[in-house]
Design a protein with these regions (language model features):
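Conserved C-terminal active-site "lid" loop/helix of NAD(P)H-dependent oxidoreductases
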Residues: 61, 89-92, 118-150
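Amphipathic terminal alpha-helices
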Residues: 142-145, 150-168
Length: 168
């Protein structure tokens, strides 16, 4: 992602006549939508990195579709973080799901995933631990004030809608 944004920044300098809309999208949730993140929510317990809140931000599929339409049409150029208001730490997500959290030290998770992936027991590797440990919390202020779109659903509402649709 960083490399792509650097290339886009270079293009803005070398071709200022071109407009760009860069969307940094949080985790997308919608009815019937399943991905690597939602896979984690279907498990018996949620895994957390000890000492990290592992906050999640979500955007509802309907909101994302509206944002994409605006970006392709009359929306302004710029860089925008796309997510609903608020962030949910993994413990709040677990509470909403009625599931326990197993918090493990980062080194234990890295070691376990380093063994599990080569054995075909996990699709995730040790590099995923940093992703859980340092999840980005996007600020959607520019999306609302500059881009002109306020998501209909907050991160919490989006998660609730997805959870209900997923039967959890």
């Amino acid at each position: 992602k960083r490399q792509v944004e650097e290339m886009l920044a270079e293009a803005r300098v070398s071709h200022p006549e071109l407009e760009q809309v860069v969307l940094r999208v949080g985790t997308v949730l919608g009815a019937g939508l399943e991905n690597q993140i939602t896979e984690l929510f279907h498990r018996r317990r949620l895994i957390a990195v000890q000492g990290s809140d592992s906050p999640f931000v979500f955007i509802w599929t309907v909101d994302l579709a509206r944002i994409l339409l605006r970006a392709a049409g009359e929306g302004p150029a710029g860089i925008f973080n796309v997510c609903g208001d608020g962030a949910l730490p993994v413990h709040e997500l677990a509470g909403a799901l009625g599931k326990p959290v197993m918090a493990l030290p980062a080194w234990v998770l890295k070691a376990a995933l380093g063994i599990a992936r080569p054995l075909g027991l996990s699709r995730y590797g040790p590099e995923q631990v940093r992703f859980l440990q340092y999840r980005p919390v996007l600020d959607n202020t520019a999306l609302k004030t500059v881009f002109g779109y306020t998501p209909e659903c907050s991160s919490a509402e989006t998660f609730g809608l997805w959870r209900k649709a997923a039967g959890l």
